[in-house]
Amino acid sequence: MAKDIEASGPEAGEFSAKDYTDPPPAPLIDAEELTQWSLYRAVIAEFIATLLFLYITVATVIGYKHQTDASASGPDAACGGVGILGIAWAFGGMIFILVYCTAGISGGHINPAVTFGLFLARKVSLVRALLYIIAQCLGAICGVGLVKGFQSAYYVRYGGGANELSDGYSKGTGLAAEIIGTFVLVYTVFSATDPKRSARDSHVPVLAPLPIGFAVFMVHLATIPITGTGINPARSLGAAVIYNKDKAWDDQWIFWVGPLIGAAIAAAYHQYVLRASATKLGSYRSNA
């Protein structure tokens, strides 16, 4: 929440300085929220956004693998595919688009790790967080289901877009990659949606979705060779449910434990270091 303060003196009319106040912490359990249409509208928005996210991105992955398959035939076989760079752009670009579209309705989480991090920071209630995560997981399953329905000839052959630990990497390496990648994403979410920044940059509505989308893009470039890049438990679960192969399920815990740890670290770092909530613990004083 922000308020305008009119400038006075010779600079009046040229600009308005913006002050801001931090919103109050969300209640842990808000039963009254269950009676409000705005909650269910937000849950629907999260479901649809995650469905669209998984449909576009997994379809891109399947299409790329088909186009680069040396044994494939048909007109698509002559195409070199979008490459890892194109896959990263598909994930980052869709997050940018969907966060921009849904931020004013649900906050544009589209990711249980983001929701979990915001819950730990008391930005959303437990009720809202649980409903969001359920909607995100169901949306992801439906989105991947659409891909399988439209690309049934290629879906299973090319791995179903499922996240799996690549050969040559240990489970510890995969877990660390997911922790660090999710930390980058959730840290960016906190920074881009910080009340102080929002008050200053509210006249440019794309400034929050843009860095979040870029964070997803950059993390994919770094971690696609290791885990296929999860950083989103709903994305990993949706692909595993529809693909339903042992390898995808054996590695599934990496794509839940890693992102949730990364989100928790990012929430603590933002709240107690960058935003100086540590002053409540009496450790130091900040004018930030």
UniProtKB/Swiss-Prot annotation:
Is Repeat one of the keywords? yes
Write out the residue ranges of the motif NPA 1: 111-113
Source taxon at top rank = Eukaryota
Q: How does it sit in the membrane?
A: Multi-pass membrane protein
The keyword Transport is annotated on this UniProt entry: yes
The protein's matches in InterPro entries, at most eight in alphabetical order, are given as:
Aquaporin-like (IPR023271), Aquaporin_transptr (IPR034294), MIP (IPR000425), MIP_CS (IPR022357)
Gene for this chain: PIP2-4
Keywords in UniProt for this one? Cell membrane, Membrane, Repeat, Transmembrane, Transmembrane helix, Transport
Protein name per its UniProtKB record: Aquaporin PIP2-4
**NCBIfam families of this UniProt entry?**
MIP
Where is motif NPA 2 found? 232-234
Example of a GO cellular component annotation carried by this entry: membrane
PANTHER family per UniProt: AQUAPORIN OR AQUAGLYCEROPORIN RELATED (PTHR45687)
Q: Where is this region: Disordered?
A: 1-24
Q: What does this protein do?
A: Water channel required to facilitate the transport of water across cell membrane. Active as homomers. Increased activity when heteromerization with PIP1-2.
Residue ranges spanning the membrane: these are: 42-62, 79-99, 130-150, 172-192, 206-226, 254-274
Q: In which tissues is it expressed?
A: Expressed in the root growing zone at 5-6 mm from the root tip.
Q: What is its main location?
A: membrane
* Family per similarity comment: Belongs to the MIP/aquaporin (TC 1.A.8) family. PIP (TC 1.A.8.11) subfamily.
The written remark on domains in the entry is: Aquaporins contain two tandem repeats each containing three membrane-spanning domains and a pore-forming loop with the signature motif Asn-Pro-Ala (NPA).
User: What are the recorded GO MF terms, alphabetically?
Assistant: water channel activity
The record's disulfide annotation reads: none
